[in-house]
Amino acid sequence: MDALKIPNLLLPAVKDLSAWAVIACDQFTSDGEYWRNLKAFVGDKPSALNLIYPEIYLGHDTEERIARINENMYSYLRQGMFRGMRGLVLVERTTQSGTRTGIVLAVDLEEYSYEKGSHTLIRSTEETIAERIPPRVQIRQNAPIELPHIMLLYDDCDGRVLSSVKRGKTLYDFDLNMGGGHVVGSRIENGEEVLSAMYSLADMSECMQKYGESDRLLFVVGDGNHSLAAAKVCWDNLKNSLTPEERTSHPARYALVEAVNIHDKALRFEPIHRLVKTDKPDLFVKYLQLGGEGKAVVAVDGRRGAVHFPLNIPEGIRALDKYIAQFIAKHGGEVDYIHGDGELKALSREGIGIMLPAISKDDLFRLVIQGGNLPRKTFSMGDGNEKRYYIEAKAIK
């Protein structure tokens, strides 16, 4: 099995790593001040900020930005801003939620699919929005390197993967900017042994025991699904022009990711609530009938009530989203996705707040195997400043 690979990494060879590493491009998409403050902090120092396209700026000077990003990548390579290393990296990220431990490795895009009902070893958790892929493809197709914010999850309840790790020398150890906490990266000395431990999690008999299905599943995508989908599209477009021999070893076939145990205590799963803004709130609530034996809390103008909600949470969210879309199409309004009970409570004076139950970590893999992709915005993993920061890179040309 070659789904996993020890990558040839490009590690930053710069003096100020706190200026180099920046948050995932899909965070703080409504917070221009965050990105302005980050740019001011970075200043003229070498930074991954110059190699990414923050989504808050999508649609603004797109062609020029992408051309500048690609040129910056080539310039950094020419100036020796990276040092090469073949190996896996043990990443220990400390945030307000605790210390989360991950492993940076490369995965075969032939073993990944974002299509619902797929049976690949690596699958998306949420429905992929087709229109969000092309901008990422446009950035990637001419880029010489990739910097990942993709986080894959694996189901290792007894911790066999991390217990197999032999920690080597420290590669980096620094504070992250903008309240991102602290990160330490160490070389893993026994990469092949660690990959073997990962492969064992997708053993057919083990999957049957854990999920009641023989469908072999190793990773689900926790963060960065649309970026991984863009990498897949770029690879599918490229491979048709390659010989069979070239396809097996081309660097674009493998995507750089960080893999984290879903049972990591510092990995928080939280529901994403809905806030519906409409001038007909009473009508919305009157016809909000989802059925089921569970409950969801509805708050309107500070008043709270409850509606029936299916015990199958993804099924309930799918039904709710369908109702919201139909209501807005007929009566007008808009929907926003809110993280945190307190924020929803505060905002419910501006609309109808629907507080959803959280899915359990223990159920995620089983839900993906049995039902395919979950509805969009089903859950989130921690706060925005806990997301992955760009540090390592890998050649894709």
Give residue ranges: language-model regions:
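N-terminal extension/subdomain marker
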Residues: 1-180, 206-208, 216, 359-397
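C-terminal catalytic or substrate-handling cores of phosphate/nucleotide-
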Residues: 275-378
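A residue-level signal for conserved active-site and pocket-lining positions in enzyme catalytic cores
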Residues: 152, 224, 348
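Compact, glycine/acidic-enriched structural inserts
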Residues: 167-188, 264, 269-289
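Catalytic or ion-translocation cores adjacent to nucleophile or general acid/base/metal-coordination motifs
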Residues: 225-286
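Active-site beta-strand/loop microenvironment that shapes enzyme catalytic pockets
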Residues: 200-242
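Short beta-strand segments
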Residues: 153, 221-222, 258, 355-357
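Portal/gating segments that form or line small-molecule/metal binding sites
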Residues: 152, 176-201, 205
